[in-house]
Every structure is written in C-alpha cells, then in structure tokens.
Amino acid sequence: MLPCLALLLLMELSVCTVAGDGGEEQTLSTEAETWVIVALEEGAGPSIQLQLQEVKTGKASQFFGLMGKRVGGRPLIQPRRKKAYQLEHTFQGLLGKRSLFTEGREDEAQGSE
C-alpha cells in the first residue's frame, strides 16, 4: 500500500508540473529540481519482502511445474507406491532407462521361437 501511495504522489507531482507550464517553452537547466523522498517505515519492509517472496515462489512453480521438477522440496504429483510384485529393477544406460525383467522376457520369447 505504501509503495503505491508513493508512486501515486510522484505521478501527481509530474502531472502538476507539466500542467503548470502554461505554454512556456521548456529549456534544460543546470539548476537542481525538487525531489520528493519517501522513507519506508520499519514495519513496512517485511510485508513487502513477504509479497516479493510469494511472487517469486509463484513464478518458480509455474516454470518448474512445466518441467516436472519439485518446488519447495515437495513433489507436485505424489507417486503411488508399487506393491512387491510390481517392482522392477531398472538401470540407466546410454540408450535410456531399461527394465531388467522386460528385457529378459523379450529374450526368452525370441529364443523360444
């Protein structure tokens, strides 16, 4: 709320200076212009930081959600546990993941033909 108020105040000042020219020609000057400095209160800092953290987390979840990665240490999709008879041993080779049981069955099927 406070940053919005400061931004609104700065916008009003710029509109007032442009409207107050009265058609005079603007020239560049080396004189110092009036600046408005707004100091944030000590209590306002953590709430702004919390809002920024929420925005960052939201962007990260959108990005990593597309890639199937975990955000914040929790999996997006909870995998179901496999029962003992459904477990298969897999290994990572140059051609990708392979199942030991599936390859063995294919070899047996080809050998019996």
Swiss-Prot record:
The modification Leucine amide is found at L95. One of its GO terms (molecular function) is substance K receptor binding. Tachykinins are active peptides which excite neurons, evoke behavioral responses, are potent vasodilators and secretagogues, and contract (directly or indirectly) many smooth muscles. Endokinin-A induces thermal hyperalgesia and pain-related behavior such as scratching following intrathecal administration in rats. These effects are suppressed by treatment with endokinin-C. Endokinin-A/B reduces arterial blood pressure and increases sperm motility. PROSITE patterns: TACHYKININ (PS00267). Keywords: Amidation, Cleavage on pair of basic residues, Hypotensive agent, Secreted, Signal. The keyword Signal applies. Expressed at low levels in the uterus of both pregnant and non-pregnant women. Isoform 1 is found only in the adrenal gland and fetal liver. Isoform 2 is found in heart, liver, bone marrow, prostate, adrenal gland and testis. Isoform 3 and isoform 4 are expressed predominantly in adrenal gland and placenta. Residues 71-79, 98-113 form a propeptide. This is Tachykinin-4. Belongs to the tachykinin family. The gene is TAC4. The lineage of its organism: Eukaryota, Metazoa, Chordata, Craniata, Vertebrata. It is found in: Secreted. The keyword tRNA processing does not apply. The modification Methionine amide is found at M67.
